[in-house]
Amino acid sequence: MAQAVNLCYGQRKYAQQGWFEVDVRKEDVTAPDVIALLQDHLKSMTMHSPPESIHALNADRLRQPDVTFWSARENGILLGCGALKELNSRHGEIKSMKTSPHHVRKGVANRILRHMLEEARRRGYQRISLETGSMEAFLPARRLYEKAGFQYCDPFAHYKEDPNSLFMTLNIG
């Protein structure tokens, strides 16, 4: 079910333009604009991380039954995406968070994250975890998760210690 939410554009020039409506909904990962955004996501991972440290899911993996994939759109235009992977009945993992390069700093990632956390609570998850990069390029993502209350933690699920990865978790139960 789609949800429309008003978001402030932020403190850049967009703030002068007012509010915009974002529709966060389950999405087909085979949509051409989604495929392009996911390819951009994977490309940016390869620019900043060695291959053994890239844990992003490809489109085939995002279609598996244990993964729910959402897009954020404004008037049909893709702004960003994110996915929630079920690790078990009480624990989920955030995957494939990506904002379109044309829509960064507008609150898109925050809106997708809030939507996924609401869904995780609805499912009865007690904890949400994630893996992100340790390099400077991933600082905006880490700040987003820190502001949402995520704490740094040890590797979880199948992950192992990696100097290129940081792990975060949020208790929501």
Where are these regions (language model features)?
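Acetyl-CoA-dependent GNAT
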Residues: 19-95, 100, 113-114, 119, ...
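Residue-level recognition of the GNAT/N-acetyltransferase active site
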Residues: 100, 133-135
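Short hydrophobic/aromatic beta-strand or adjacent loop that forms the aromatic wall/cage
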Residues: 67, 163-167
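Conserved GNAT acetyl-CoA-binding A-motif
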Residues: 120-133
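Conserved active-site alpha-helix within GNAT-family acetyltransferase domains
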Residues: 110, 135-154, 161-163
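Intrinsic, low-complexity polybasic segments
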Residues: 3-4
